[in-house]
Each structure stands twice: as C-alpha cells, then as structure tokens.
Design a protein with these regions (language model features):
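Active-site groove signature of glycoside hydrolases
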Residues: 310-312, 386-414, 516-518
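Glycan-association/targeting regions that enable binding to alpha-glucans and other polysaccharides
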Residues: 1-154
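Short amphipathic alpha-helices and their capping/turn segments at secondary-structure boundaries
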Residues: 12, 140-145, 208-220, 294-298, ...
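Short, well-ordered coil/turn segments that N-cap beta-strands
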Residues: 218-220, 298-302, 398-403, 433-437, ...
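Active-site rim elements
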Residues: 197-200, 280, 376-379, 407-413, ...
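Substrate-binding/active-site clefts of carbohydrate-active enzymes
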Residues: 157-220, 227-397, 425, 431, ...
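Conserved alpha/beta catalytic core and glycan-binding cleft of carbohydrate-active enzymes
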Residues: 316, 391, 422, 426-427, ...
Length: 558
C-alpha cells in the first residue's frame, strides 16, 4: 500500500513536469517577469523591520501575479517555501516567518519558474547566489524613528545670522594661522581664501531669532557645525569640549583692553580673548543660552544634533595650550605643550621627550600643527573624558538629539581600537539618551561600523551626493574634476547607487544625511556650470558664472 502511494506521487510529479514542458513547447506560459520581483528591508517586507534577538519576523516577497511556480526564503540555517499571503494590483505577495537568534541573520530568495531558477538579494535579481549580497538583519540594531526621512537643515553658525553683536570676535582679538582675527563689517562680503579667522558674527541668538523661519520651511532637524570654544569660524579645532564658545553664546565679563597691536602675535598677550573664553561666567552663560535654544527647538517639535570632533582637537585646546592662553589662568592646569608634568601629557603623542617646556613635537592630524591628534591609546583618562562629553550634551539640560562625528574612522591609531572606541561611545550615548542618533562622516564603505553596535548611519556621500553629482552635473563634489562620460550616464548612476546603498543596510539608509552639498564641498549650484576650480585660483566669480538653476531644481526634487 505504501509503495502504491509512493508510485502514485511519483507519477503525479512526472505529469506536472510534462505539463510544464508542454506549456513551454506550446508557448502557453506567461513570460517570466523578473522586473516584478522585489523585497527590501522596509517594514512592508520585513516585520518588525528592526527585530531583537528572539523575535519572530515575517518576511515578504513580491512577484507578478501567477508568474512563478515557487519562492523560497533561504538563510544560513534553512530553506523555507514561502506561501502566498495576498494578491494586489497585479502582484502576488509571498511570506514566511523566521525566528531571529543572537547572530546576524542573512537571507536571500530563490525563485523557480519552470526550468528557470533565479535568486533575489540586496542587489536585485541574479542567476547565481553570491553570499556577500544577502539581506542582513543585525538583531537589536534600531535607529531613531524621528530620524527616518527627516528634513535636516545644516547651520554653519558664524554665517547664519548675527543675533547679538556684543559677542562678536573683534579685529586683532588674537592671532591664528599667520594673522590676526578679523571682524567682517559687511555681511555680504565674499569670504577670503584663507577665511578661517574671518568672523561674520553669526551666533546662537541668531538661530533663536530664525526658528519661525526654519519651522515654516519644514525643517525637522537642525544640524549645527561645531559650537564649542575654538579660535576658528569652522570650530573643527576645539579648545574646550565642555563649553559653547562665548562668541556664539553670551559674553557677560569682558576686557576693554588686550587687543594685539602691530606685529604682536603672542596670544599670551591677547587679554580680551583670554577673558572671553576662560571666564567661567561667560562659559556658563553660553551653555545656558544653548540649553534655552534646545528647549525651544524641542518645544516646536524639532530636533537638534551637534558636530563632535573627537579625532583631534585644536592647538588652542586647554589640554595642549600651545598659545599659552590658560598657562596663568586660575583653575586651569598646565597644558601638555607647556609642561612635561601636565596632567594632559598623555592625551597627545610627543616625538621629542627632551623638548619641554613648550614642546612642539606633538603629532598633528595630517601633520597640521593646529590640529593635535588625540592619543586615546595613551590615556584612559582621555578616553573616558570624551565618553562623558558624548553623554553630557545629549543629557539634561541640553538634551541634544545626537552627534555628527567628524572624520570618525580616523580616531585612534588602529582599526581595532577605532571600533572599540565607537562601541563604547554608542553604549555611553544611548545609555544617556536612547533616541539619540550617532551619524558619522565617512568616505568609502561604512559596513564595518554599521552592525548595530557602533554608528547608526553616515553622511551619505557614496550613495547620494557623489553619484547624483556626477549624473546631473558631470562634476566631482569639490569641483575638482569634470567628466562628460558620467554626465547623464544612467547606467553608471544606477550602478553606483545600488552598490553603495547595499553597504548601508535599511536602518542606516533611512536615517542617512542626504545632502547635495555642505561645508566640505562646492555648492551644488556651482557644479552645474561644469567649471573645474576653487576660489584660491579660479576666483569667486567663477563659482556663480553660467550656473543652471533648472538642474539644481532637479536635484532638489530627487
């Protein structure tokens, strides 16, 4: 009886196979529509989209209606035949359920159509399975819901709005990179080529004054370039991580003297600057103003993220004190440049142990002596200090909603150390504010940092700014190169987008910072003129000559 049943089953399979063959011979089968095949990591096709270990996940796959014979969900552990769970608008939807363990869950789809077997992975349809292209689930990796698809507005504070002229940097207040600070009197003046010491007066009060405007624009997240104490207008050379620069905040205690005159370039004589940036009343008043700003931003239902520059600091930094600003100030220990006995000596790497006092032999990031590289491997105290900084600003009373991390992959002196630091940084920040985002500046493949225990996402250069710029303008994002072969090249554009989007994973992709341009690159509108060059040798006029606003509108629409 059992043998008869087995023989009958085998006969039925043979009949079905013959039927399929006849359908091909008679051209009765519908054409296989591989373009209809689809799945991704969004909540519609994966529920929950960001599962934790132990969760049961429903995974779905789409085909054209009545167009395939079977669909299988294939993982490293099992091959499960999926069942049709619905039909809508000419599509069949297949589903299967899996339980997620502690480890990364990788999967792909196997589609059978008559004699044809193909596969679907993170890159789309393929005829051969490639494991590196599988969909991936990192258990417990979730990104803040508020950041998914949010409209972000970047503010380079000094160039936004001068809301409080009493805190403006004045001409000759101090000396920096070869010359004295300059107070720009005319807001519309074109910035100098070496404009890091030119100040237009933008500040936090200016942002406060324009919140109605920003809200009316539909801004949901404000991203501020660095705001901590610093001698430059870009402030990627931090002087004190614990305080907002009083030139952006409040100056309640000032010095009427102490401007550098004539050839004097000794910042230990810059009494006005020293008073402004070391007096605790100014520093605390500036932090209080920032707390008021963040509270008002949150009251309006908006978010705010800060720029964290933790790979390096500035030569003015109180830990280094190359300018001897803190050397004789009460309450400040000697900087590592000043004394071999400084408590901060191990915060930096010095190449000449016999060069004190005033040791200039420290390592600078990319050899810039104004940007001392922080030596985390040499100081657990520094390591813990920066973790506390990460926590401080996302906690009360500031309650910032996250960090943009400058040159994040450069931190430390090895890849292993870099990854360990960002794992600890994530734990510290998320413990203080679970809904804070950790968004890194990164060029190249970020996969190694996007596994759920380091960064949430990145500034999306590779999967947005770069390919879109080449496609619409033929220009490199700094305006350093023009390639006519990439202008309007849809094949190159789609290929680049698919390749680089795969590296981000869906949670990171949904929260990535998609910009057309920013402070590190030429303006997108400038790129539409197809002119290679920079202000330093092409002149400022070249940036606006022959631009094409229509292309800019296309980019904004995308």
């Amino acid at each position: 009886m059992i043998n008869d049943r087995e023989d009958w089953t085998e006969m039925e399979h043979e009949k079905a196979d013959i039927k399929k063959r006849m359908q091909y011979i008679l051209n009765m089968r519908p054409v296989f529509n591989k373009e209809a095949l689809f799945s991704d990591g969004t909540e519609y096709y994966r529920t929950p989209a960001e599962p934790k270990a132990g969760d049961t996940v429903t995974i779905k796959f789409r085909t054209q209606r009545n167009n395939v014979d079977s669909v299988y969900l294939v993982s490293q552990e099992q091959r499960v035949q999926m069942e049709i769970c619905g039909t809508e608008n000419g599509f069949d939807y297949y589903s299967a359920q899996v339980t997620i363990g502690e480890d990364i869950f990788r999967y792909y789809f196997e589609i059978q159509y008559g004699w044809v077997t193909c596969y679907y992975n993170n890159q789309g349809v393929c005829m051969k399975h490639e494991g590196r292209m599988d969909f991936e689930i990192y258990p417990g990796f979730d990104t803040p819901k508020w950041a998914k698809g949010a409209v972000m507005y970047q503010i380079y504070v000094d160039r936004f709005l001068n809301g409080d002229p009493t805190n403006d940097v004045v001409t000759g207040e101090y000396h920096y990179i070869g010359d004295k600070s300059v107070q720009v009197e005319q807001w519309n003046k074109i910035p100098a080529v070496m404009g890091v010491r030119e100040f237009y007066g933008g500040d936090l009060q200016g942002i406060m004054n324009k919140l109605d405007y920003l809200q009316d624009l539909g801004v949901e997240v404000i991203y501020l370039n660095p705001i901590f104490v610093s001698p430059s207008n870009h402030k990627y050379d931090c002087q004190d991580y614990d305080y907002v620069d009083p030139h952006y905040g409040r100056i309640v205690e000032d010095c009427n003297e102490g401007i550098l005159l004539g050839d004097d370039d000794d910042n230990s004589h810059a009494w006005k600057y020293i008073k402004r940036v070391t007096d605790k009343k100014n520093l605390e008043a500036s932090n209080e103003l920032f707390a008021k700003l963040t509270a008002e931003i949150h009251r309006r239902g908006m978010k705010i993220i800060l720029d964290g520059v933790f790979n390096h600091c500035g030569s003015f930094n109180k830990w280094m004190d190359r300018e001897r600003i803190y050397e004789n100030q009460e309450g400040y220990p000697k900087g590592a440049y000043v004394s071999a006995d400084s408590p901060y000596r191990n915060f930096f790497s010095f190449n000449d142990p016999n060069a004190w006092p005033y040791n200039t032999s420290y390592d600078g990031w990319w050899a810039h002596d104004t940007l001392p590289k922080l030596n985390y491997e040499g100081s657990r105290e520094l390591y813990d200090y920066i973790l506390r900084v990460g926590q401080k600003w996302v906690s009360a009373p500031y309650n910032v909603d996250g960090w943009r991390l400058d040159v994040a992959a450069d931190l430390g002196h090895s890849n292993d150390f870099n990854h360990q630091f960002w794992k600890d940084f994530r734990k510290a920040v998320k413990a203080a504010n679970p809904n804070a985002i950790i968004l890194a500046e990164h060029y190249g493949n970020p996969e190694g940092w996007l596994k759920g225990d380091e960064w949430d996402t990145v500034m999306n250069y590779d999967a947005f700014m770069e390919p879109l710029t080449w496609f619409l303008t033929g220009m490199e994002k700094h305006s350093d190169e023009y390639r006519e072969d990439l202008l309007g090249n849809s094949e190159a554009f789609i290929g680049a987008m698919k390749t680089h989007m795969r590296a981000l994973h869906m949670s990171a992709l949904q929260t990535a910072m998609n910009e057309l341009s920013n402070h590190d690159h030429s303006r997108f509108l400038t790129r539409t003129n197809h002119r290679v060059g920079r202000i330093s040798y092409a002149g400022p006029e070249a940036a606006s000559e022959g631009v094409n606003p229509a292309v800019m509108r296309e980019a904004v629409t995308i």
